[in-house]
Amino acid sequence: MVRRRRLRRRISRRIFRRTVARVGRRRRSFRGGIRF
């Protein structure tokens, strides 16, 4: 939980969108639809 918040604050929105696009598919399968 805390890591997610820190990542959102540190990572800019542009990079965050790219990360979600790449990792989002993997994380969705792992955590069942929960984003970064």
Swiss-Prot record:
Example of a GO cellular component annotation carried by this entry: viral capsid
Keyword flag RNA-binding: no
Main localisation: virion
Cytoplasm is among the record's keywords: no
Highest taxon in the source lineage: Viruses
Keywords: Capsid protein, DNA-binding, Host cytoplasm, Virion
Record's subcellular location: Virion; Host cytoplasm
Gene Ontology MF term list: DNA binding
Family to which this protein belongs: Belongs to the microviridae J protein family.
Role: Mediates ssDNA packaging into virion, it locates to the internal surface of the capsid. Additionally, plays a role in viral attachment to the host cell.
Protein name (record): DNA binding protein ORF8
